[in-house]
Amino acid sequence: MGLRPQLAAILLCLLACTGNWTLGCHHGALKEIIHILNQVTEKGTPCTEMVVPDALSARKNSTEKDLICRASQGFRKFYFQHEVTLCLKNNSRVLKDLKKLYRGISSLFPQKSCNVNESTYTTLKDFLESLRRIMQKKYWQCGSSTF
């Protein structure tokens, strides 16, 4: 008997379309996020000593989705002109990269809201390095060790 051609085409399309999204592993998005994080955390990058809420604190009680959501919320503020510091206004490349990180991270696990602990603060550099470690771990868990 076999499969009807239309059904075979639909099954093939479904397989191809979902292949890279298995179990929350978004290889392309993770790779791009890690690449941007590597660039922004390079020595000499301006504005990385600015203080930001430590959105990644209290990781022991948090799920991966919670961490990614809070990281996304941390970057979201860079879209609001009144939240952008003078340093970032004068260094548009860094601001552009932070906005790319927001888009990339929020695409991993789109959530409407999550709570960010604004009682503790860290430097942007430490925040970005913590996030890079989380993203690299996620990438390696997805079965790739390019980074």
Swiss-Prot record:
GO terms for molecular function: cytokine activity; growth factor activity; interleukin-4 receptor binding. One of its GO terms (cellular component) is extracellular space. Residues 1-19 form the signal peptide. Gene3D superfamilies: 1.20.1250.10. Glycans are attached at residues 20, 61, 90, 117. It is found in: Secreted. Disulfide bonds join 47-87, 69-114. Keywords: B-cell activation, Cytokine, Disulfide bond, Glycoprotein, Growth factor, Secreted, Signal. GO terms for biological process: B cell activation; immune response; interleukin-4-mediated signaling pathway; negative regulation of inflammatory response; positive regulation of DNA-templated transcription; positive regulation of macroautophagy; regulation of immune response. Pfam families: IL4. The keyword Signal applies. The keyword Cell wall biogenesis/degradation does not apply. InterPro entries: 4_helix_cytokine-like_core, IL-4, IL-4/IL-13, IL-4/IL-13_CS. Belongs to the IL-4/IL-13 family. Participates in at least several B-cell activation processes as well as of other cell types. It is a costimulator of DNA-synthesis. It induces the expression of class II MHC molecules on resting B-cells. It enhances both secretion and cell surface expression of IgE and IgG1. It also regulates the expression of the low affinity Fc receptor for IgE (CD23) on both lymphocytes and monocytes. Positively regulates IL31RA expression in macrophages. Stimulates autophagy in dendritic cells by interfering with mTORC1 signaling and through the induction of RUFY4. This is Interleukin-4. It comes from Mesocricetus auratus (Golden hamster).
